[in-house]
């Protein structure tokens, strides 16, 4: 019995898709993925070559990133530049998240490192330090001291035009963010850095307390052993004293018996002498 052909798609239709969607899928490049699938897929780990390229691209587009808060197009240009350098394709959002995470890691290490000590062994610490050293440390929103104040109209024109590299007109990067939606995240990260610093300062105190507690326990055990040894010596001395008293008592008894024998001998001699004289 042969089944009749159903209304479902034929094998040729499955193997050779037709229509606008099929043609688009066939003509489109293999690396293009839908935004939903791209958003939910697992991000690949960054290789060492990608990280070195990212440092160079970040330094190249650093001034351009500071000119505006809405810099998605700048990140896309950075992604294209990184693709030209390494041959690896990354989204602008991936580069944005990676730069944010690396900036947080750099600030955490800088907070935990003294100015006189050697820099951390993180391989990208010095490179990020050189990139972020381009901006001043203050974040009060004022212009640098080298920029003289002018009329309000000139200030408006200067704010609209791209700033020159010699006199940058952007907010400092260390504290004032160029991404408005990450302000709350940075405040949380700064509080976490402070708590981390306080924890690192509390650790030596706790360590000293534990060491002093162990030392006190050792001293207590030593004192208990010394007291027990003293008691044992006291018992031995008491036993020796009792033995000495017993020996002295026996010696006294022997001396008394010896005196009695001497008296008896003297009395016998006197009797013998009296008998011989008679």
From Swiss-Prot:
Disulfide bonds: none annotated. InterPro entries: Myb/SANT-like_DNA-bd_dom_prot (IPR026095), Myb_DNA-bind_4 (IPR044822). One of its GO terms (cellular component) is nuclear body. Pfam families: Myb_DNA-bind_4. Residues 44-129 form the Myb-like domain. GO terms for biological process: positive regulation of DNA-templated transcription. Residues 1-27, 138-168 are annotated as: Disordered. This is Myb/SANT-like DNA-binding domain-containing protein 1.
């Amino acid at each position: 019995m042969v089944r009749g052909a159903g209304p479902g798609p034929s094998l040729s239709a499955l193997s050779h898709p037709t229509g606008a969607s099929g043609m688009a899928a066939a003509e489109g490049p293999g690396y293009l993925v839908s935004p939903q699938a791209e958003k939910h897929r697992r991000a690949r780990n960054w290789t060492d070559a990608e990280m070195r390229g990212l440092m160079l691209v970040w330094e190249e587009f650093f001034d351009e990133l500071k000119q505006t808060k809405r810099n998605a197009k700048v990140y896309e240009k950075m992604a294209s530049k990184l693709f030209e350098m390494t041959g690896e394709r990354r989204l602008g959002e991936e580069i944005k998240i990676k730069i944010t995470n690396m900036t947080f890691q750099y600030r955490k290490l800088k907070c935990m490192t003294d100015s006189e000590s050697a820099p951390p062994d993180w391989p990208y610490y010095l490179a990020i330090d050189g990139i972020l050293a381009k901006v001043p440390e203050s974040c009060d929103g004022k212009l640098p001291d080298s920029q003289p104040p002018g009329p309000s109209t000139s200030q408006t024109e200067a704010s609209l035009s791209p700033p020159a590299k010699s006199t940058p007109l952007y907010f400092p990067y260390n504290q004032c963010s160029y991404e408005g939606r990450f302000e709350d995240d940075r405040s949380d990260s700064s509080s976490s850095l402070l708590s981390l610093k306080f924890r690192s300062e509390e650790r030596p105190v706790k360590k000293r307390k534990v060491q002093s507690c162990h030392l006190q326990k050792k001293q207590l055990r030593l004192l208990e052993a010394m007291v027990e040894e003293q008691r044992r010596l006291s018992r031995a001395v008491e036993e020796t004293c009792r033995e000495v008293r017993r020996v002295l008592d026996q010696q006294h008894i022997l001396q008394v018996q010896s005196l009695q024998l001497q008296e008896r001998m003297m009395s016998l001699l006197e009797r013998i002498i009296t008998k011989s004289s008679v």
